[in-house]
């Protein structure tokens, strides 16, 4: 091997190591901190991550008062300055069919392409959100319904169905546990 070839090879290897080391080192810095709770209930950041835009600080505005529940209480999750998720905590006296709610054009929880989900509570998943409901007796009513609506997603694509189902599988029962149902 000629000395110029050895120098070129050494420079190439050193450059490769610097690039890979930089990616490893700075890749961790770029990873943002996701919340470990959502609207007052613990949630795994790994379950929340696929539902949020990839960049921006995550914050929330939570108007849910579990001690004095209102018929409907919103909680909004922001990424940067934009709303990414809208959650609606609703207490009511009559049982509802979440599929009818999801299909109604008059509903604030209207979903695109809703289908029933194979989960313990009555749940529907759409391309842009999910609705779960269960019996939960409190001073605000005997039923509780949680709607999760994604903002800014294409309602014709089913990209978020699996992540929404994962969220509702774990998050909805955890929310219900915090409500003091009798």
Placement of each model-derived feature along the sequence:
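Functional cleft and adjacent loop/helix regions within the main domain
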Residues: 1, 12, 52, 56
């Amino acid at each position: 091997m000629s000395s110029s070839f050895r120098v070129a090879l050494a420079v190439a290897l050193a450059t490769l190591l610097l690039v890979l080391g930089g990616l490893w080192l700075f890749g961790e810095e770029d990873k943002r901190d996701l919340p470990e709770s959502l609207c007052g209930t613990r949630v795994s950041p790994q379950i929340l991550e696929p539902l949020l835009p990839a960049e921006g600080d995550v914050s929330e505005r939570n108007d849910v008062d579990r001690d004095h529940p209102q018929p409907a209480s919103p909680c909004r999750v922001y990424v940067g300055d934009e709303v990414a998720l809208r959650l609606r905590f609703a207490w009511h006296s009559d049982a509802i069919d979440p599929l009818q709610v999801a299909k109604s054009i008059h509903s604030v929880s209207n979903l695109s392409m809703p289908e029933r989900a194979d989960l313990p509570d009555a749940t529907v998943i759409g391309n842009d959100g999910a609705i779960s409901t269960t019996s939960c007796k409190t001073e605000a009513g005997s039923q509780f319904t949680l709607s999760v609506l994604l903002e800014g997603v294409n309602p014709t694509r089913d990209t978020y169905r699996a992540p929404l189902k994962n969220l509702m599988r774990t998050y909805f029962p955890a929310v219900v546990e915090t409500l003091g149902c009798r």
